Structures are given as structure tokens and as C-alpha cells.
Amino acid sequence: MPIYTPEEYPAVIERIKAKIAQKNISMGPTISETEIAAFESACNTRLPQAYRLFLLEVGDGWNDPAAEGIASPIHRLAEIERKDLSRPMTLTDGWLWEDEEDEEQLSDESFERKLGNQGVELMDEGCGMTYELITAGPCAGEVWSFSDVGVSPCCERQDFLGWFELWLDSDGDPDYFKDYVYKEDE
């Protein structure tokens, strides 16, 4: 699942709707442009177009208590923490701070410079692992994995629609890192 182009969005949205119906998944209701704009205003950001279309045309979040332990819920916009998302994440590749030997790279300033304000938390997998939609910086629009040891883009790199479609196709247990190869800086 790639990062789709805006021209592909209508077909991808329709394909996702068909898969949701086929799998009998109960999405949260769609939300209005006004609700999206209120979130954006509160967080000082503009949500990526793919995610906005999903909220407007497909639904807002997913939570099936009967599927507990099978798949984590996808947060509804109203549940997402309101924080300033205007500072960009400057990373373009993964960063494992657990392996970092340079103490300067582990300073609060370094974290803030590299991670900005992170992103919109889409899903909490537990054990310190979340999936977040990056809203500012060179990777804006991509979904990244955040954990207690580092951050990395999903591989192949995915926007929200690609990330969600892979989740659908894998019955809630996707391998978002199947092609990821971490490269140490030399």
C-alpha cells in the first residue's frame, strides 16, 4: 500500500468502503468539515487530505469490543489529544534512540528538534507503541510508528489510506515493517 496521489483518493475511498462493508466493520459515523476545522484550529494544524476525506466520507474511528485482543481500536477525532501540532517532525528516516551513544542526541532539545510535536495518534498498540499521522515536516501525511525505543515510518511508506487499507487487508494484524531496513548513520 503506497502513498496515494489525490487523483487516486476517490477510487481508494470506494475500495475501502467496500472492504469495510464486506468485513462487516462498524466504523464511527462520518464527521463534518466544521468538526475537522475545530480540531485543526485547536491543534494549530491542517490534517492531511487523505485523512480528512476518510473522516468525511468513510467514518471516524473504529472500536469493536468483541474484537478485543484481536485488533486495537482506531481513535475517533474527538478522543485524540489536543496539542499544538505546528512544529514539524524533521526526521525522514527511522531513529532508534535506544542505540544512540551520543548524549547530545538524547537531550530534550534534540528530541524536540527531530520529533516536533509528533503527530495525531491514530492507534495505541500498548507497551509504549503507537501509530501517528505526521501533520508537519517533510513526511507530513505519512503514518509512523512511535515506541519507547524509537520511531520509524511504516514500510513501505504509507499515508493514512494506505495504512488503513493494509490494516483492513490483514484482518487487523498487519506487518507494517515487513520491508523496513534500519540503516545506521556513518
Predicted feature locations:
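Long, compositionally biased interface segments
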Residues: 155-186
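A surface-exposed partner-binding patch
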Residues: 1-124
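Intrinsically disordered or highly flexible coil/loop and linker segments, enriched in small
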Residues: 25-26, 128, 173, 177
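Short leucine-rich amphipathic alpha-helical surface patches
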Residues: 124-126, 168
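Intrinsic disorder/low-complexity segments enriched in polar/charged and small flexible residues
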Residues: 64, 97-99, 146, 165, ...
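Segments surrounding the PLD/"HKD" phosphodiesterase catalytic module and close analogs
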Residues: 129-162
